[in-house]
Regions:
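Hydrophobic transmembrane alpha-helices of multi-pass solute transporters/permeases
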Residues: 125, 152-155
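Mid/C-terminal beta-alpha module of Rossmann-like enzyme folds, strongest
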Residues: 53-113, 142-153
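NAD(P)-dependent short-chain dehydrogenase/reductase
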Residues: 1-41
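Conserved C-terminal active-site "lid" loop/helix of NAD(P)H-dependent oxidoreductases
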Residues: 47, 105-136
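Glycine-rich Rossmann NAD(P)(H)-binding loop
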Residues: 10, 37-40, 67-74, 84, ...
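Alpha-helical substrate-binding/gating segment
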Residues: 26-67, 71-72
Length: 156
């Protein structure tokens, strides 16, 4: 059995952990997105759902093959909206930054122009039906993932 999670989000064992998801999330909290957000669409999953999927895959005898573990097809803008609702004091832009602008600043934001050209503005949807059907996965709501993560980071 192979477990393939999408963009992993949510509270961690160590609130000071480092990962791409922690860096992205901290960008919302630190004001990195105050002028606007990239048109970045992605599939994402709560870290606790990833852990549950691993356990279920290990204990369900019929589990086999590859499982896409993904709770939601979402976007940076949606994450920003949820955070703003949870904490109105956060300074998060409410508009989508143009792709050409993202392309220009790519080197300054630890990205490449190729990454911007191939990821910004394109939908990315993951299909999780096999994990739901075979592993009986029930994914946590995106709002809970973000709320719990925000609470953990504020407490640390």
């Amino acid at each position: 059995v192979t477990i393939n999670p999408t963009f992993v989000m949510g509270p961690g064992i160590n609130p000071f952990g480092t990962s791409e998801s922690f860096d992205s999330f901290n960008g919302f909290l630190n004001g990195d997105y105050k002028i606007g957000l990239p048109d970045l669409k992605m599939a994402c999953v709560d870290v606790r759902d990833v852990a549950r999927a691993h356990v279920k895959a290990g204990f369900i005898p019929s589990a086999s093959g590859r499982y896409i573990i993904s709770g939601h097809n979402s976007a940076f803008m949606r994450i920003g909206e949820i955070l703003k609702k949870l904490d109105p004091s956060l300074v998060i832009g409410e508009k989508i930054l143009p792709k050409w602008f993202m392309w220009l600043i790519a080197p300054k934001i630890n990205s490449t122009r190729k990454e911007i050209a191939t990821s910004i503005g394109y939908p990315f949807n993951a299909v999780n039906l096999k994990s739901i059907n075979d592993l009986n996965m029930e994914y946590l709501p995106l709002e809970k993932t973000i709320s719990d993560w925000l609470c953990q980071l504020k407490e640390s």
